[in-house]
Amino acid sequence: MKRRVVITGMGAVTPIGNTIEEFWDGIRSGKSGIDPITHFDASEYKVKLAAEVKNFVAKERMDFKAAKRMESFSQYAVAAAKEAFEDAGLDMAEEDPYRIGTIIGSGIGGLECHEKNYKKLQERGPGRVNPLMIPLMISNMAAGNVSIQLGLKGKCTDVVTACASGANSIGDAMRAIQYGDLDVCVAGGTEASICPSGVAGFTALTALSCNPDPASASRPFDKDRDGFVIGEGAGIVVLEELEHAKARGARIYAEMAGYGSTGDAYHITSPAEDGSGAGMAMKLAMKEAGIQPEQVDYINAHGTSTHHNDLFESRAIRYALGKAAETVVINSTKSMVGHMLGAAGAVEVIVCVKSIEDQFIHQTIGTEHIDPECGLNYAVGSPVEKKIDYAMSNSLGFGGHNVSLIVKRYEE
């Protein structure tokens, strides 16, 4: 019999706030984190906007010497993980470190580090490359650094499934606890790829919005959408086996109820046009949660603001929920924080938890004219206040990776 898994801690570094409190205040107020790019000179680029993390000072959130040996994606993960761990109230003096794991995904890792050192290699020769380039840039170092900083000696892995990385990480952590491999797991996603090659690459792929207006560049499910806005940051949760959490008197935010993961086997960047792959992930998550489609109160969609994703994801929701797809409330957090890539799914699970807690579904800002081809019940224009017992979070990644996670209101 699978063990029950609950959420006891949360942490976030995002374009609208560098703590859970700041982030959620921004979400509730409909704040946008999209602004002109400042990380580099983008004057010659077609894309001028990004959702950058602001006012983040690594040495204020972690050991200064350790921070110097981390790229931003690792720093964001460590900061968010420390917040989540403290929020959970875990005391390592009372815990078996081999029963606490770390599963943190990143879709890209240290792209900027690779970029800068390649430039050094070309201009100044191989002797000038940073000797720490490899451990700085490889994507598993977010999990590695969190494990080191918190002293966690259980299973430690990095899930890389593009923009589904954070969601898969939480799902895999859920499984590890359900089947007894761990009692606690620090899980989520992180990303920091707002750099020249990152923006140029996504632009060449025609994935990014070229809209110069920060207020309307990210407008998921809008008929005039033209691409996503690249974002960055980290979202981390502490997952815990229910009896372990109860035994130490932990505050329980919500329960992990379902996890579905599928592959489209269709295209390297586009979701399956009929939505069957993502739809099946939702069906699998509902099956594990033991619920019917009409019991899903809220869907936090992948909702990237690209033509293909929003249309095909809407089809996937219809595929999975049938008639219930017409009434379930759907939104996209990416309208506020842009597409945080490997961190997106984890941050959006946090939104689901906070939405259950506050009985509040944020609006999808920037979206004004719903695409009739998408045509579902998107929260646009104003937030929705309603009791939420089951919230679903969808994540889709290049390569055909589909993940659906269901979070439920905790009850004994």
What are these language model-derived features?
Residues 181-226, 259-273, 303-310, 327-377:
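Acyl-CoA/ACP chain-elongation machinery
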Residues 7, 23, 28-161, 190-199, ...:
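Conserved beta-ketoacyl condensing-enzyme motif
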Residues 1-66, 243-255, 350-364, 408-412:
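ACP-dependent fatty acid/polyketide chain-elongation machinery
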Residues 4-8, 35, 213-289, 298, ...:
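Condensing-enzyme catalytic core mediating Claisen C-C bond formation in acyl metabolism
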Residues 21-28, 112-126, 176-179, 199-212, ...:
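A glycine- and small-aliphatic-rich helix-loop capping segment at beta-alpha/alpha-beta transitions
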Residues 124-130, 171, 175, 191-247, ...:
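Glycine-/small-residue-rich "gating" segment that lines the acyl/pantetheine channel
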Residues 77-90, 139-143, 147-191, 229-250, ...:
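Active-site-proximal alpha-helical scaffold in enzymes
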Residues 84-96, 245-249, 282-298, 320-324:
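Phosphate/pyrophosphate-binding loops at sites that engage ATP/ADP/AMP, CoA/4′-phosphopantetheine
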